[in-house]
């Protein structure tokens, strides 16, 4: 019999063996070397057990995040793994379904993950929330601005509240309000086993206006003279453009120390238009985190315009959660929404059920609309959805495109 339950502390050896094989197999068969830090307020562990044996496991997070201007609790799914001899037997799929159901029971509407294989998660209803642009510059290219009026200062875990204030000042959907433990153990700590990162802030008039967290790595070449030092930015946050320019200027000051500066920014941060000699830079577009709604009734917790009155039928397809796969009546009165399932006589997948629905979408696209990956017209072009003209205007009032940035990896 397969059961879903927390992974007890007494099973840590099994868990280390699973996670070491799944995520760092290049270290060889040495699960005892895998670091499994378990601060109680960072995550908890869930697993599928069959006849007492651990088959599949994951880390389950809870975050305080910004969603369309509201402070909300969202879930996080990380380190999803199955033993190699048990793969392709639906364990990971079943584990994911149980995690989503548990989050829904706890009142969590939205869950995020960092995908290892995007197509795999897409088949289970997850959608890419946003993209990143990864840049590689020489340090000299970042010295395009005059020296800023403020000053630079080293920051540590003791500054976590000031750092959090900077991140919240950026006002982006999916930005996390991280706990003190997260700042100390993850953002500024050696959680990956590669050493503590460096961290500096930019201050002006006594106020922290931005900060950057980074590592410096040496990459060997075929000869000692070909070795490259790379400054890799883990996180860069600023409350305004002055803070951003100041931090880029700070990174540019490493020209005598490193050969390359690598950083990742949201797509609207168009650094090629600012740096010197942009034709010599490298810029690649990469998929970011994925998101998924736990239930269609999550629409009831969105901030709908107070003057909006509308009613429409919504057809949703969900390959993983049966309760989401069907038709729903959405009613909005004076900005207060109500979502109710509509009973149908046929099979949930019958095309006849789509007849008469004002809006048809899969859970992936609905999740992207929910966080603001697309606005409605763009979703029709890029997503798997179709909207009657009568609902385009009211839906556009709630599903506007947002600036998104979930930068914390988990």
Q: Could you say what each language-model-derived stretch is?
A:
Residues 47, 53-63, 76, 81, ...:
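Conserved beta-strand in the GNAT
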Residues 86-95, 242-246:
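Conserved acetyl-CoA pyrophosphate-binding loop and the N-cap/start of the following alpha-helix
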Residues 130-146:
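Aromatic-anchored glycine-rich loop motif in surface-exposed flexible loops
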Residues 103-115, 256-266:
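Conserved GNAT acetyl-CoA-binding A-motif
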């Amino acid at each position: 019999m397969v059961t879903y339950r927390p992974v007890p502390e007494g099973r840590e050896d099994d868990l280390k063996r699973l996670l070491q094989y799944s995520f760092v197999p290049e270290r060889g068969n040495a699960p005892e070397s895998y670091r499994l830090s378990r601060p109680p307020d960072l995550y908890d562990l869930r697993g599928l057990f069959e006849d007492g044996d651990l088959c599949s496991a994951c880390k389950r997070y809870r975050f305080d995040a910004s969603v369309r201007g509201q402070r909300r609790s969202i879930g996080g799914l990380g380190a999803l793994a199955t033993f190699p001899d048990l793969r392709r037997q639906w364990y990971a799929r079943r584990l994911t379904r149980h995690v989503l159901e548990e989050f829904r029971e706890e009142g969590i509407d939205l869950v995020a993950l960092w995908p290892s294989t995007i197509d795999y998660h897409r088949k289970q209803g997850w959608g890419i929330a946003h993209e990143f642009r990864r840049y590689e510059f020489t340090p000299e290219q970042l010295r395009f601005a005059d020296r800023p009026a403020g000053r630079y200062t080293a920051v540590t875990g003791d500054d976590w509240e000031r750092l959090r204030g900077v991140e919240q000042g950026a006002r982006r959907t999916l930005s996390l309000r991280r706990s003190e433990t997260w700042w100390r153990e993850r953002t500024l700590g050696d959680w990956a086993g590669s050493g503590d990162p460096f961290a500096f802030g930019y201050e002006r008039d006594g106020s922290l206006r931005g900060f950057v967290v980074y590592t410096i790595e040496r990459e060997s070449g075929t000869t000692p003279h070909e070795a490259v030092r790379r400054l890799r930015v883990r996180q860069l946050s600023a409350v305004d453009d002055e803070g951003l320019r100041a931090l880029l200027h700070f990174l540019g000051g490493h020209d005598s120390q490193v050969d390359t500066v690598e950083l990742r920014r949201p797509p609207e941060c168009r650094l090629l238009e600012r740096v010197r000699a942009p034709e010599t830079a490298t810029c690649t577009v990469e998929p970011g985190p994925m998101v998924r709604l736990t239930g269609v009734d999550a629409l009831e917790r969105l901030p709908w315009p107070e003057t909006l009155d509308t009613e429409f039928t919504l057809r949703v397809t969900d390959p993983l959660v049966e309760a989401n796969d069907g038709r729903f009546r959405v009613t909005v009165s004076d900005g207060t929404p109500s979502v109710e399932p509509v009973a149908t006589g046929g099979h949930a997948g019958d095309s006849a059920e789509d007849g008469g629905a004002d809006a048809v979408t899969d859970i992936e696209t609905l999740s992207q609309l929910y966080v603001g990956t697309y606005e409605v017209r763009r979703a029709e072009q890029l997503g798997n959805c179709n909207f009657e003209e009568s609902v385009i205007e009211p839906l556009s009032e709630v599903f506007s495109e947002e600036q998104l940035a979930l930068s914390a990896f988990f």
